[in-house]
Amino acid sequence: LTSGHNVQSTVFIEVSAEYRPDGPEEMRPVGEVEFVENLVSNRGGSSPKTAAAIIGKADLKLGNNVRPVLEALAAASPDRFRGIRHSVGWDASPDILNREIQGALSTESYRDGARQLADMGFILENSLYFPQLEELADFAKAIPDLTIVVNHIGGLLRIGPYANRDEEVFGEWRKGIALLSQCSNVVMKLGGVGQARYGFDWSRRSKPVGSEELAGSLKPLMEHCIDQFGVDRCMFESNFPVDKVSYSYNVVYNAFKRLSMGYSSTERSSLFHDNAVRVYSIGG
């Protein structure tokens, strides 16, 4: 974080860790927010501001009954808690890790839970796979007052049944991104492509990928997102430490800088800083 990229703040996104060991099952994820809040509070004033915003986890399938969980999460971090991530990635292939039941976004219970989230002024981080983008668009239209932050350029897949089919896969992904971009309450995060399911070989190389090559690989993907959503609804994400299996923090941020060189200083400020400050309500 202090390696020359002028990182001013970070956002903590849940990783299903440090849960409460007992108590009601639905309340156990509160332990993760309690852990992070305690960690950050004990550090005192620091620069950059670590975990200036915290995204926890709650099961939206609880429907209206998720509200006490959200209240507990907010109480655990009154100044930093901003919302939750409920990953809904599902695919019929056994090669793809399923994180939710099929069609979770379309269930009334999940939507009722999401309405509780919106009513309390919190945001929803959403991680899914690209064949679900149309379902997410329908969900976003049904709850227009909920800000939805889509993770990792919309869940591109290039493994299992999606391997060696780039023309078809990229075509369907582009269509899904274009459809989702019509929902004004949706924001896109640009990153997370170092994970194995994105089908690149960077993690298997004997020599690490450099920022110039990485920028070349990322540019067409991220430019499509920016073209569809606009500069004001996109933001770069490191997805660290998860993505460090494929490249270093320095390399990925240098790649972001390279691929964004054609944008104005104001546009780059939006992509690297301003949009995140707005979406996550990060103070000065």
Each model region followed by its residue ranges:
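Short histidine/acidic/glycine/proline-rich micro-motifs that form metal-
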Residues: 16-22, 55-61, 195, 240-243
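Alpha-helical elements of Rossmann-like donor-binding domains used by nucleotide-donor carbohydrate transfer enzymes
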Residues: 35, 68, 72, 135, ...
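Active-site gating/metal-coordination segments in enzymes
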Residues: 23-132, 138-141, 154, 163-169, ...
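Conserved residues at the C-terminal ends of beta-strands
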Residues: 13, 57, 87, 191, ...
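Conserved, mostly hydrophobic/aromatic
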Residues: 10, 36, 54, 84, ...
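Mid-to-C-terminal alpha-helical segments outside catalytic/metal-binding sites
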Residues: 1-9, 223-224, 228-235, 242-284
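Active-site gating loops and adjacent loop-to-helix segments of metal-dependent hydrolytic enzymes
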Residues: 1-21, 26, 76-101, 146-147, ...
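Catalytic pocket-lining loop regions of alpha/beta-barrel enzymes
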Residues: 100-235, 246, 264
